[in-house]
Design a protein with these regions (language model features):
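Interdomain motor-coupling "hinge/lid" segment immediately C-terminal to the ATP-binding subdomain
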Residues: 1-47
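A generic structural signal for residues located within well-ordered alpha-helices
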Residues: 4, 28-31, 65, 125-126, ...
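Non-catalytic, well-ordered alpha-helical scaffold segments
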Residues: 6-11, 30-37, 51, 68-71, ...
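Conserved NTP-handling cores and scaffolds of large molecular machines
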Residues: 16, 20, 40, 61, ...
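Short, locally clustered residues in the helix-turn-helix/winged-helix DNA-binding domain
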Residues: 38-42, 58, 135
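DNA-recognition alpha helix
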Residues: 50-62
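A cross-kingdom feature that marks ATP-driven nucleic-acid transaction machinery
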Residues: 69-239
């Protein structure tokens, strides 16, 4: 039954994978690392860092869990291939920036079971699937940031940061990828395209959307393709 499958996955995560991490690294703060896993599972695709997580433990749970310990525990989880870390990359400045990273789960089934199959946000889950597939194909994957100047409601010039879901590199190849579950509204299209419009180079820019749509290019030269097509075609980025 579905319940048995879910219980099996939860048991595997807690009593095999997580227990192995705890025993191999002689972790004393067992409750804390369990909650840390839940925090990371709840925040796939959301930039965060050990300091933010420590503040969450202090304010919401009244638990002392230091930045250094959290950082070590995240490294242990990554070494066990439970999670992967994606660094933030300043596309215009051509440099890595800040302490914030995005964390993705290697096995979404285990992640979903850990959360009792709550928090099934389609966009973040799609993003995690695309990230995993890019790693499987041998690409180096970062999270992109593009700085732009815009005007606020009062007409003042303000600096804004736009995000590109993935900056994907392999040798001299590079792709910029946005992942969007829903592109039906003009507002959503503007949000997804605006980051790509402000990248000052000619590498391929791709938007992966829900569904099985074959690749096509819009008027701006961006490639748009369905998730199913992306996953089932190993050379899908070459369109």
């Amino acid at each position: 039954s579905e319940r048995q499958k879910a219980d099996y996955l939860k048991n595997i995560f807690a009593n095999v994978y997580l227990r192995d991490v705890i025993e191999r690294n002689k972790i004393q703060s067992v409750d804390e690392i369990g909650i840390l896993v839940d925090v990371l599972a709840s925040a796939i695709g959301v930039p965060t860092n050990p300091s933010k997580i420590a503040n969450t433990f202090a304010s919401e749970r009244q638990m002392s869990y230091t930045n250094k310990t959290i950082s070590n525990h995240i490294d242990y989880l990554a070494d066990a291939f439970l999670i992967s870390k994606a660094s933030r990359y300043d596309i215009k400045g051509r440099k890595y920036i800040g302490a914030n990273m995005k964390y993705y789960f290697t096995d979404l089934g285990l992640r979903n079971a850990r959360l009792n199959f709550r928090q099934q946000e389609p966009t973040h889950i799609m993003e995690n699937i695309v990230y995993n597939e890019l790693l499987i194909r041998g690409y180096n994957v970062d999270v992109g940031v593009v700085d732009i100047f815009d005007k606020d409601k009062e007409g003042k010039r303000v600096r804004k940061q736009l995000e590109v879901d993935f900056v994907v590199n392999q040798g001299n190849q590079r792709y910029y990828i946005q992942v969007a579950y829903d592109m039906t509204s003009e507002e959503k299209q503007t949000q997804e395209f605006n980051s790509l419009r402000n990248i000052p180079d000619s590498f391929k820019k791709i938007v992966i959307v829900n569904g099985s749509k074959k690749p096509w290019r819009n008027d701006e030269g961006f490639v748009i393709m369905g998730m199913k097509y992306f996953l089932l075609n190993a050379n899908s980025l070459e369109f």
